[in-house]
Amino acid sequence: AKTFKYIILG
């Protein structure tokens, strides 16, 4: 779930 990390980082 690397996508979530990028989403949070924006």
Curated annotation (Swiss-Prot):
Q: Which reactions does this protein catalyse?
A: 2 monodehydro-L-ascorbate radical + NADH + H(+) = 2 L-ascorbate + NAD(+)
Cofactor names: FAD
Keyword Amino-acid biosynthesis annotated: no
Q: How does activity depend on pH?
A: Optimum pH is 8.0-9.0.
Gene Ontology molecular function: monodehydroascorbate reductase (NADH) activity
Query: What EC number(s) does the entry state?
Result: 1.6.5.4
Query: What family is this protein classified in?
Result: Belongs to the FAD-dependent oxidoreductase family.
What protein is this chain from?
Monodehydroascorbate reductase II
Species name: Glycine max (Soybean)
The record lists the lineage as: Eukaryota, Viridiplantae, Streptophyta, Embryophyta, Tracheophyta
